[in-house]
Design a protein with these regions (language model features):
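Catalytic centers of hydrolytic enzymes
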Residues: 1-142
Length: 142
């Protein structure tokens, strides 16, 4: 990976925040990401889903047929960590259908890094010759 390619892929070098959300809140956030507008060409935000998360979304039912993390269903009351860049943090309600006030009730919000690009650059420097496979983290059914 050339540095210019990295900058092209990550043109906005924001801070990265860690939020704590309940399983019920996380499911609501994911439902918002997968709303009909996301598949109709309207402007929506779409996110990277972490390794271990598996979602099978039925568009016709508007529901998850499967929603697991590390092979286990999300627990509605358990707290999960979610990382977002500053731009998304500043627009939580619009982009993820959760208010900052709701998130703050779950615990202190932390800044993990002041530069998302630096984190990725460091990872790529330390972990060279990476390969990729399609894991099927998100499956969308009609």
């Amino acid at each position: 990976v050339h540095y210019a390619d990295l900058v092209e892929c990550l043109p906005y070098d924001d801070a990265v925040y860690m939020l704590k959300v309940t399983g019920a809140q996380l499911e609501r956030m994911l439902r918002h990401i997968l709303r009909d507008e996301a598949f109709q060409g309207e402007h929506t935000e779409f996110y990277q889903f972490s390794h271990g998360l598996r979602m099978v979304w039925s568009r016709s039912e508007g529901a998850f047929r499967e929603l697991t993390l590390d092979g286990e269903p999300l627990h509605p009351d358990r707290l999960y960590s979610v990382a977002v860049q500053k731009y998304h943090y500043n627009n939580l309600k619009d982009f993820l259908n959760i208010s900052l006030e709701e998130v703050e009730q779950n615990g202190k919000i932390r800044v993990l890094s002041t530069s998302a690009r630096d984190v990725i650059e460091e990872y790529l420097t330390v972990n060279q010759h990476l390969s990729r496979t399609v894991e099927g983290r998100l499956v969308v059914e009609p």
